[in-house]
Amino acid sequence: MVKKRGTNLPAQDFLDAEPVCKHLRKALDDGSVKRALVNVEWTMCQDCQADNKEKNNSEDESAEDPSVWLCLKCGHRGCGRNSVAQHALNHYNTPRSEPHCLVLNVDMWSAWCYLCDNEVPYNRTSRLGQLVDYLQRKAKAKNKNSNSVVSNEEVKTEIVTENEVKKIQYQDEKPDVQAKQEKASSTQKISTEPTVKGLSNLGNTCFFNAVMQNLSQTPALSELLNEVKTFRKPVTVLLPDSSSPKILEVNLEQQPGPLTLAMWQFLTEMHETKKGVVTPKELFSQVCKKAIRFKGYQQQDSQELLRYLLDGMRGEEIQRVTLAMSKSLQSTLDEEEIKKIVKDYEKRRTIPNFVDCLFGGELTSTIMCEECHTVSLVHEPFLDLSLPVLDDLIVKKNSKSTPPARERKEEEEEEENDDDRYVKERDEVSPGASKHLQKKAKKAAKKQAKNQRRQQKWQGKTVLFTDLAKQECSEDEEEVSQTKTNTRPDNETPTADGLNTMETDLSTLENGNEESADGLNTMETDLSTLENGNEEMAGGFKTMEMDLSTLENGSETIKSAVEGITEHTDLDSSVHNNVGSVETNALVGNMENNNNIEVNKTPERTAGSGGDSMEAMAAVENGNADAVNVDDTEAVNGLIDSANMDHELTNSLNRLQLSSDLEPTQVEIEILPDKEQPHTQVYEVVNEDPKTAFSTLSNRKDLPIDEFSVLSCLYQFTHKETLTGNNKLLCNVCTRKQASRLNNSNKGEKKFVYTNAKKQMLVSNPSPILTLHLKRFQQNGFNLRKINRHIKFPEVLDLAPFCTAKCKNVPEGESRLLYSLYGVIEHSGSMRSGHYTAFVKLRHPNQQLCKMLFTGVIPEVSGSEPGQGSWYHISDSHVQAVSLSRVLSSQAYLLFYERML
């Protein structure tokens, strides 16, 4: 047999055989690109360069263009989408016979297809990869031949230092040894002092650059990454055990993950390079591999990038530690036990890693039951705190209050228009018709609609009643003696869902003179005995249960026999869930002397119910159609149409057996089966005084809270809540108490008790680096909006009013927990199109904080003043010194605070 080609090809060969982009063959021309790049400046947009020559612009403005995209069809060099001119995009949009959709980023060496609107992957063996390799070699050779370009800032600093040295030399013609030492120390300070550098924009990557600027000014992160890179010391892992905790020392033999190494390389380059602008292409590519959503050079969110970056490095470090743990435990435990232990550590977040050590903190949610006053705790880790902006709460209140009013209005309109579904609109009525004819037509249409709805309703209910009657009726009990029932209290309410009983208030009828009683509020039938003589029926508002007997036919008069009325009876639960409410205004009397039946018209009559329809039905069945006196002939037609349905309903109701088994219970317990246990969070019940359960590290009442400030956002985030209604607490203590009181009738079922409770979330373990996220981007209904209001934030933040009284990593007796601001990320513009910039504080590293991270020892006395430093505003590659007031007036989106020790 002959082998098929491509069956044993490696993965890279498959990529060559099946290219991802279908436009690759037509949009790639090697010869044209190589000819176009002879003796040209690759890092400059050729259109911008031509415009600058015409306009005589400065070189600084042209240098701000972050990225250059090379057309792989003709070799055109244009600026990217994030620039103002967008020459590369305009070059693609120019109509041509062949597509110029494939471009290459000269800084990052990534290919992009405009038609696919996606990145084009390639390898070295492919045609595109060979061209990229050729261009990279040409770029390196050109850089070696050309002189090293020094940034403008470094040139300025070198000129300043040379002038200062010359001044010192000319001032002192005979310098002594001390002057030489001072000059040497000054030059060393200039060289060792931390600097601020710009970052190249790789294509709408300002969100990435702003985060990287703040992380580069976090000295503790660089120290921890250096420790991770060298892995000198073994990692100690605490093995929690009920009997005796053990300490396991793990030697990390494996190298850190690719994202961690890229982060270490980026921070090293930021601190040690002499360039004024750094290109973080390797780090950004590793982030895109971890999170595909950041591919494509689209506008993204800085807070999401920070979370993905930290979570990615944390996952790599945890994986490295768990592999070392499994190797060290192989000699004593089985593989299955090791897997269980590792999973348990991951759930408890007890595996040490540098991300949790620096950015990680802990929130504690305290919940107290208002019935038994049991205090329970829930611990939740955090890497940053997302704080709601106060303006968002007002919008939520308005959005919550408006829909119910609209719904009520719509329901009222539906109820009003329900009777007019079959009525023509006013505009359709001819203007020549008289008002009397219009009213008559509307009345006729309404009555016809009522009759149709009546038939539809009783068709469903008749079938339902017949099915229930077959289940509930007993064959032995055919006749039940007449009894009177006692009245039910007004406040008694049925317990079954959907229970609608039927009441009728019957007034006395003497010698054919009938009087209808008004004001019937209940819906149960109160039927008294009907005799053949001139007897009055018992009237009044007596609520009685109904078991209707059959209506006898064959005589001219109606003989109503009411049988089977029992005392204090309710409908069975199977009937309660299905029977609809039926209002009846029955007019029943002694009809021996009167053969005529008058049906009084009522304004609104419920379909298929009432003595009117029953009497008219009986008269029609007996052949006395003339005895029915009505004003409208259409009403008679409606009664004739519904006569059969009413008769079937009456026969079905006769077979209903009424029971009084249900009683309203006072125990507020929701019984759920074992399979439907509510998904609740596990709480740790603690023995704590309810009076001090919600106490904080310092008093919250004396806070100078402004309406729109970070303090107000923190106060709103940690305020005390009351859990009521659907948010009630599932209290295990109350459940056990209630279960002990109940009888053992419901075996095999668990009973859960929900009670009102109080809840408050506070910080129980502060993080060394506190990151605050202000939720400016909100979703209001189907629209997205940004809150542009200025939120005040302090330079020194005291977190003690928002921490628990038993807060960890705080010295005893300390009532302050101070943080110093060192970084801000600002978002300007709207949600659709905006720009991220960074404010960073250039300062010396906090040695006390680094000591606490490595040793775990907390100094007894913390600092009260922030360290000295200078602030800079960085927008991609542009760096500018600013004042503190400019920083505090910015529209902050992310705030970076460092703990003061």
UniProtKB/Swiss-Prot annotation:
The record's section on SMART domains has: ZnF_UBP
Q: Where is the USP domain?
A: 197-900
Chain spans, region Disordered: 398-502
Q: Which positions are annotated as binding Zn(2+) 3?
A: 71, 74, 91, 100
State where composition is biased (Polar residues). 482-494
UniProt GO molecular function: cysteine-type deubiquitinase activity; cysteine-type endopeptidase activity; histone binding; transcription coactivator activity; ubiquitin binding; zinc ion binding
Q: Which residues bind Zn(2+) 1?
A: 21, 23, 113, 116
List all Basic and acidic residues biased stretches: 420-429
* Compositional bias (Acidic residues): 410-419
Q: What is its main location?
A: nucleus
A GO CC term attached to the entry: nucleus
Q: Which reaction does it catalyse?
A: Thiol-dependent hydrolysis of ester, thioester, amide, peptide and isopeptide bonds formed by the C-terminal Gly of ubiquitin (a 76-residue protein attached to proteins as an intracellular targeting signal)
Q: Where are the zinc fingers (UBP-type)?
A: 19-139
Subcellular localization, as worded in the UniProt entry: Nucleus
Enzyme Commission designation: 3.4.19.12
| Comp. bias (Basic residues) | 436-456
Does the record's keyword annotation contain Cytoplasm?
no
Annotated active site: 206, 835
Domain of life from the UniProt record: Eukaryota
Q: Which residues bind Zn(2+) 2?
A: 45, 48, 79, 87
Function, in words: Specifically deubiquitinates 'Lys-120' of histone H2A (H2AK119Ub), a specific tag for epigenetic transcriptional repression, thereby acting as a coactivator. Deubiquitination of histone H2A is a prerequisite for subsequent phosphorylation at 'Ser-11' of histone H3 (H3S10ph), and is required for chromosome segregation when cells enter into mitosis. Regulates Hox gene expression via histone H2A deubiquitination. Prefers nucleosomal substrates. Does not deubiquitinate histone H2B.
What HAMAP family does the database record attribute to this sequence? UBP16
Q: How does it assemble?
A: Homotetramer.
Q: What is this protein called?
A: Ubiquitin carboxyl-terminal hydrolase 16
Q: Which organism is it from?
A: Xenopus laevis
Classification from the root reads: Eukaryota, Metazoa, Chordata, Craniata, Vertebrata
